[in-house]
């Protein structure tokens, strides 16, 4: 995953400049290489498992690299892994736990001393006794001490709940915990612990804690501490292991085939080993005619040109076109490689193995990642390629099968928001593949009641169903590498039980409700203008997650009559409000959310002005800069974010309105849209004036339905 992330980062930052022309070159070269390999003619002189017509000797002395490698691998594998036991690791972990308990004692003692002094001082001055030091202050003090004097990692690896429990523990219980946990860590670390048995040691330690004298309330905390403290103390020494294995491998004498050595005698059966040696000595090579090489080159160039011209016609940004071509070519090349494997299996005389080819793999993936048109295009590409590569009597039948199977997968795959629906489509494609094979066998007047027919049907089903299984497994890899956001991933993110959504609900319920309302408004607008409504809805769910860091400072989370901004300067309030977009983007990045969701959190306010605090600051400082009170942006880069930009402001403004009549709602919406236009907030995305008009009308209709005036019925008096 780290490699995929590095690739994606390079692709986002630099790849857009260089990858577009390089894409076609790589696509053409690799495809050309595979096609040439698949169509390379077989030798007619020597065949596997057949009798050699004459004695063949080695024309030269060469190293049998495969045999040498095999022997060296055996020698290397025979060397056992080297592990180094470090006793100091155990001592250090015990000392770490002891330090933790010591600092908890120290923090409590300091707090007690401070509270005593404060009480005495207040008593002398005839003032009310001040509140004792809070647990939060003690927790901060403890974490500062641990970070400074022990390790910064300890505060990030042990939860605040554990620290708080230790701070608040009674002296007697605390001492019991300290004794038992320290003893358990010391006892556990006396064992030789590797990564393989680390979990079992931790489980045993936690079981000991469960049976210990520690009060039940503190057992989970104690278990957490021993789990953190117990680490491997016998570490795999990669350097020594590699050195010993390298030494063992190098000690192996290279296996050689000597000049004049008999490879196969006349009349002898050519087995796999003999055949391999003949290939290694290039005694089976039979070059293709130059015209054939040229023909394949023209074929690949034609495919690349079709893909290029078709993609060029699409109304997409250049970077998006590049990504589309890269995805298409990658999937095509994977299919080509699968075709290569099937052709190899054919050389092993496995009857009807061609029907095992997963023709549905490429169209299934491309329909989910791109669209239906690219899926059908891949079917044509693969079918035409198979026409060139399957060089036997059944070539046309296999090509027709691939064409039908691929097209069927595109038609059958309708609901791909759920994995179960995808797998059901794959099962249906497998069954339909069996029908296609039966039809082809009937057309060829083949005998149906034989084992090879049953095998062909089985291969056809496995090829269809297996293609979908492979596709489901590969799609997350494409999502990671290219930063894609598929429908299934969006549905997953829309689940109310997602940890981040639960976090918003628990920490900022007002923001959660606001986000749901904005999602309903924005989704309706996206549907009307043909934008990605699911992306808009899910993006709204997470767009204000940055507010969870300081919920009370945002109006929707404030209790009636309590506004913490009353105690702050405009500058302080500005910093808190403006930071929620960046904070949200950071939270989403830390949780490995897709880039489009991160972009929504970062861009949903664009570079708009925080007017209230700007004018408030201007009252005391006329020279205040407007730029200092604008969001850092960037401005919305897509029409989906532009929709959220408008809907977010409209929802907040209408909700704060005392009388949201239809006239008032219309006035608010028109004012916000006009303000955004005059401020140039939509200059960097592809949204049109006509689309904004549709958004306006949709917002008016939707909000009027929510806030419409109800008929007031008179009270029913007896």
UniProtKB/Swiss-Prot annotation:
**Entry-linked PROSITE patterns:** HD
The HD domain extends over 511-653
Q: Which residues lie on this side of the membrane: Cytoplasmic?
A: 1-17, 311-324, 414-421, 479-718
Q: Which ranges sit in the Extracellular compartment? A: 39-289, 346-349, 392, 443-457
So where does this one cross the membrane? Answer: 18-38, 290-310, 325-345, 350-370, 371-391, 393-413, 422-442, 458-478
| Reaction catalysis annotation | 3',3'-c-di-AMP + H2O = 5'-O-phosphonoadenylyl-(3'->5')-adenosine + H(+)
| Amino-acid positions noted as binding substrate in the UniProt annotation, renumbered to this chain | 514, 544-547, 555-556, 631, 648
Effect of disrupting the coding gene: Grows as well as wild-type in culture and in macrophages, double pdeA-pgpH mutants have slightly defective growth in culture and in macrophages. Single mutant secretes 2-fold more c-di-AMP, double mutant secretes about 4-fold more. Single mutant induces wild-type interferon-beta (IFN-beta) transcription by macrophages, double pdeA-pgpH mutants induces about 10-fold more IFN-beta. Double mutant is 10(3)-fold less virulent in mice, suggesting increased bacterial c-di-AMP is detrimental to growth within the host.
Chain sites annotated for binding Mn(2+) 1: 514, 543-544, 648
- Catalytic class of the enzyme: hydrolase
The main location is: membrane
User: Which superkingdom is the protein from?
Assistant: Bacteria
Binding sites annotated in the UniProt record for Mn(2+) 2: 544, 580, 604-605
State its role: A phosphodiesterase (PDE) that hydrolyzes cyclic di-3',5'-adenylate (c-di-AMP); there are at least 2 PDEs for c-di-AMP in this bacteria (this and pdeA), this may be the major PDE for growth in liquid culture. During host infection c-di-AMP is secreted into the host cytoplasm which leads to interferon-beta production and secretion by the host. The cytoplasmic HD domain binds and hydrolyzes c-di-AMP to 5'-pApA; has very low activity against c-di-GMP, does not hydrolyze ppGpp.
Protein's name in the database = Cyclic-di-AMP phosphodiesterase PgpH
**Organism of derivation:** Listeria monocytogenes serotype 1/2a (strain 10403S)
What taxonomic classification does the UniProt entry list for its organism? Answer: Bacteria, Bacillati, Bacillota, Bacilli, Bacillales
């Amino acid at each position: 995953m780290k490699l995929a992330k590095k690739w994606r980062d390079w692709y986002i930052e630099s790849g857009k400049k260089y990858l577009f022309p390089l894409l076609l070159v790589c696509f053409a070269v690799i495809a050309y290489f595979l096609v040439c390999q698949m169509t390379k003619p077989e030798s007619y002189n020597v065949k596997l498992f057949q009798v050699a017509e004459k004695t063949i000797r080695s024309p030269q002395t060469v190293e049998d690299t495969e045999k040498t490698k095999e022997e060296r691998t055996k020698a290397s594998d025979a060397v056992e892994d080297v592990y180094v036991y470090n006793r100091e690791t155990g001592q250090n972990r015990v000392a770490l736990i002891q330090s933790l308990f010591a600092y908890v004692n120290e923090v409590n003692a300091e707090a007690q001393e401070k509270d005593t002094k404060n009480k005495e001082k207040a008593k002398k001055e005839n003032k009310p006794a001040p509140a004792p030091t809070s647990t939060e202050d003690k927790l901060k003090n403890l974490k500062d001490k641990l970070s400074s004097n022990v390790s910064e990692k300890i505060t990030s690896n042990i939860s605040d709940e554990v620290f708080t429990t230790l701070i608040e523990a009674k002296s007697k219980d605390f001492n019991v915990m300290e004794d038992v946990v320290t003893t358990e860590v010391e006892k556990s670390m006396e064992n030789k612990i590797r990564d393989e048995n680390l979990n079992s040691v931790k489980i045993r330690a936690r079981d000991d804690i469960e049976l210990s004298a520690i009060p039940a309330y503190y057992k989970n905390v104690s278990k957490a501490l021993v789990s953190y403290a117990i680490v491997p103390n016998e570490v795999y020494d990669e350097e020594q292991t590699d050195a010993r294995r390298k030494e063992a491998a190098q000690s192996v004498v290279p296996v050689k085939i000597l000049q004049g050595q008999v490879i196969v005698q006349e009349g002898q059966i050519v087995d796999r080993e003999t055949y391999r040696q003949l290939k290694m000595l290039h005694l089976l090579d039979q070059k293709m005619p130059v015209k054939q090489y040229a023909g394949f080159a023209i074929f690949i160039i034609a495919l690349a040109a079709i893909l290029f011209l078709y993609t060029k016609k699409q109304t997409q940004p250049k970077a998006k076109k590049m990504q589309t071509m890269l995805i298409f070519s990658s999937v095509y090349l994977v299919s080509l490689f699968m075709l290569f494997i099937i052709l190899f299996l054919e050389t092993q005389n496995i009857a009807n193995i061609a029907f095992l080819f997963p023709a549905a793999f490429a169209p299934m993936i491309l329909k989910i990642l791109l669209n239906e048109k690219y899926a059908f295009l891949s079917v044509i590409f693969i079918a035409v390629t198979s026409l060139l590569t399957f060089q036997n009597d059944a070539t046309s039948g296999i090509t027709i099968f691939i064409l039908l199977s691929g097209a069927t997968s595109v038609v059958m795959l309708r609901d791909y928001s759920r994995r179960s629906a995808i797998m059901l489509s794959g099962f249906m494609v497998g069954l339909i593949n069996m029908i296609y094979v039966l039809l082809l066998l009937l057309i060829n007047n083949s005998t149906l009641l034989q084992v090879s027919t049953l095998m062909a049907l089985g291969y056809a089903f496995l090829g269809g169903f297996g293609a979908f299984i492979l596709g489901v497994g590969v799609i997350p890899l494409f999502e990671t590498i290219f930063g894609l956001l598929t429908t299934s991933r969006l549905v997953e993110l829309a689940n109310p039980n997602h940890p981040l959504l639960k976090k918003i609900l628990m920490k900022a319920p007002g923001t959660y409700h606001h986000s749901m309302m904005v999602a309903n408004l924005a989704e309706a607008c996206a549907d009307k203008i043909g934008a990605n409504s699911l992306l808009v809805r899910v993006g709204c769910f997470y767009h204000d997650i940055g507010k969870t860091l300081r919920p009370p400072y945002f109006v929707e989370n404030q209790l009636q009559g309590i506004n913490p901004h009353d105690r702050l300067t405009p500058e302080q309030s500005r910093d808190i409000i403006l930071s929620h977009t960046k904070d949200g983007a950071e939270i989403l990045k830390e949780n490995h959310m897709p880039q489009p969701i991160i972009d929504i959190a970062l861009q949903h306010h664009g570079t708009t002005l925080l007017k209230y605090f700007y004018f408030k600051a201007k009252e005391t400082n006329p020279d205040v800069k407007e730029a200092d009170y604008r969001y850092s942006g960037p401005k919305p880069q897509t029409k989906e974010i532009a929709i959220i930009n408008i809907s977010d402001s409209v929802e907040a403004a209408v909700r704060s309105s005392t009388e949201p009549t239809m006239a008032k709602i219309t006035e608010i919406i028109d004012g916000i849209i006009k303000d955004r236009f005059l401020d140039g907030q939509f200059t960097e995305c592809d949204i049109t004036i006509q689309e904004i008009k549709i958004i306006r009308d949709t917002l008016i209709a939707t909000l009027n339905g929510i806030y419409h005036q109800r008929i007031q019925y008179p009270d029913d008096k007896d």
